[in-house]
Swiss-Prot record:
Gene3D superfamilies named in the record: Bira Bifunctional Protein, Domain 2 (3.30.930.10), Class II aaRS and biotin synthetases, domain 2 (1.20.58.180)
Family as reported in the entry's similarity comment: Belongs to the class-II aminoacyl-tRNA synthetase family.
Pfam families (alphabetical): tRNA-synt_2e (PF02091)
Keyword Hydrolase set for record: no
Lineage: Bacteria, Bacillati, Bacillota, Bacilli, Lactobacillales
Main location: cytoplasm
Superkingdom of origin: Bacteria
Name of this protein: Glycine--tRNA ligase alpha subunit
Length: 305
């Protein structure tokens, strides 16, 4: 590799590449979440018959993974570059390899392996066939073909490509610690994120108010249900995300037992399933506006509209 791309240049390169493949460039969703998959730009749009092609960077918070800014590879918050394409292009893996070449990684010169790793997210009732992508022995990407999202079967199938930006940048820049990654010319990752990592880790493991969080979970769950009673899908899903993040904080604090943990996950999953069903029903009521006219008329006729 000749020029070592900065973190932001990696993002810009991926944005331009997937824009050229027909993806809309979305912005990060303004609610805490554990993965780019949980953004409504993936979770909601992966279900139903309408096409959807989008790419976006998603900061992803995982309180239990925080290490006070001291571990070179474990983070409270990391960044994913998320690509979702529905229906899935037949050449999606080839497109992915092309994107690596633009980042200076020639597939012919490196050991790139697709290692089977079927994916499941119990808290959202989602699952799919998947592969981890290993670059010279290090996982850099997760490939998933969704089979179920929010408890609903996906048709057409959505392909998801999730790049781990910190890992990818560490490899490209040949550094052993994420904190040594060059975010922009002259600015290191650690200069931006070391202190927030320390503070969020301290909060997650030592300072968070368990009683407050337990009460918040109950209130967020109730508000999600109230929104769903009013058929307000997007506000309801916002509260599902808040429930998920609140649970993750409780889990990191050790505030829930193994039995309670399963119960909390089931409660989040049940909400997510109702959100998914309500969203699809709403899109149908609107006449599936993202479908072309011929397909829309045929589908609505088949569904008895």
């Amino acid at each position: 590799m000749s020029k070592k791309l900065t973190f932001q240049e990696i993002i810009l390169t991926l944005q331009q590449f997937w824009n050229d493949q027909g993806c809309m460039l979305m912005q990060a969703y303004d609610n805490e979440k554990g993965a780019g998959t949980m953004s409504p730009y993936t979770f909601l749009r992966a279900i139903g018959p309408e096409p959807w092609n989008a790419a976006y960077v998603e900061p992803s918070r995982r309180p239990a993974d925080g290490r006070y800014g001291e571990n070179p590879n474990r983070l409270y918050q990391h960044h994913q570059f998320q690509v979702v394409m529905k229906p899935s292009p037949s050449n999606i893996q080839e497109l992915y390899l092309q994107s690596l070449e633009l980042l200076g990684i020639n597939p012919l010169e490196h050991d790139i392996r697709f290692v089977e790793d079927n994916w499941e997210n119990p808290s959202t009732g989602s699952a799919g066939l998947g592969w981890e992508v290993w670059l010279d022995g290090m996982e850099i990407t997760q490939f998933t073909y969704f089979q179920q999202v929010g408890g609903l079967p996906t048709h057409p199938v959505t392909a998801e490509v999730t790049y781990g930006l910190e890992r990818l940048a560490s490899y490209i820049q040949e550094v052993d610690s994420v904190y040594d990654i060059e975010w922009a010319d002259g600015v290191k990752y650690g200069e931006i994120f070391t202190h927030p990592e320390y503070e969020h880790s301290k909060y997650s493991f030592e300072v968070s108010d368990q009683d407050l969080l337990l009460g918040n979970f109950e209130r967020f769950e109730a508000e999600a249900k109230r929104c769903l009673d009013e058929h307000l899908v997007h506000p309801a899903y916002d509260y599902v995300l808040k429930c998920s993040h609140t649970f993750n904080l409780l889990d990191a604090r050790g505030a829930v037992s193994v039995t309670e943990r399963a119960g909390y996950i089931a409660r989040i999953r049940n909400l997510a399933r109702v959100v998914a069903k309500t969203f699809v029903a709403e899109r149908k009521r609107l006449g599936y506006p993202l479908l072309d006219a011929e397909t829309r008329e045929k589908l609505l006729a088949e569904e008895g509209e």
